[in-house]
A protein has these predicted regions:
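Residues that form generic nucleotide/phosphate-binding pockets
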Residues: 16, 20, 116, 169
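Substrate-binding cleft of secreted/luminal carbohydrate-active enzymes
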Residues: 87-105, 109-113, 119-179
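Short, composition-biased local secondary-structure segments
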Residues: 23-25, 111-114
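Polysaccharide-binding and catalytic clefts of secreted carbohydrate-active enzymes
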Residues: 1-87, 93-100
């Protein structure tokens, strides 16, 4: 975590944090390791999501979000505590190739995500199509569905050949497509 580049260390956030705790996070040698500052950041983003959710759901609408993969990774990487957000569905961006992982990582990330939402929302595994071509395509789908995903979404693809493969896969598994 680099204050100058990756996360907000603006004057307003620092002042509000100081009002709560009596200290400026930048006074710490390693602010990125200060649990109070981390919690402040997690809570700040969660409050924004809660306000949006109240408005959207107050209008009777369904609310979903594309989030970073796996709640623990999202908390660490981008301060998204999305496992505690009041959404109806989550699309964790489980781009296994981006993280130099195989299709098995998709299953682990889905399992963690499903556990975090504990039945109160659907998990749709967000898959990066170029990462799951060839034999990895069905392996990735198995990993997602076998670990509790309600479905999958594709980022950057798939092409017509893989759409045919997807339909055949869903038919074999007995899944009924949503309208």
């Amino acid at each position: 975590e680099m204050p100058e580049y990756d996360y907000c260390y603006c004057d307003l956030c620092r002042e509000r944090f100081k009002a709560q705790t009596g200290r400026d996070p930048m006074d710490s040698l390693y602010p990125m390791e200060d649990q109070s500052w981390i919690n402040y950041r997690l809570d700040g983003i969660t409050r924004v999501v809660e306000k949006i959710a109240a408005r959207v759901k107050g209008d009777g609408k369904f609310l979903s979000g594309a989030v970073f993969p796996g709640p623990s990774m999202a908390r660490r990487m981008v301060r998204q505590d999305w496992g505690n957000w009041p959404l109806d569905a989550y699309f964790p961006m489980i781009y296994n190739g981006f993280y130099y992982e195989g299709p098995e990582w998709i299953g682990r990330s889905v399992a963690e995500s499903v556990k975090a939402v504990n039945g109160r929302a659907a998990i749709y595994a967000g898959l990066m199509f170029p990462d799951i071509t060839g034999d990895d395509f069905e392996k990735a789908l198995d990993e997602a569905y076998d670990n509790g995903a309600s479905g999958v979404s594709f980022f950057d693809g798939p092409d017509d050949e893989y759409l045919v493969r997807l339909k055949a896969y869903l038919d074999r598994r007995g899944f009924v497509p949503a309208n």
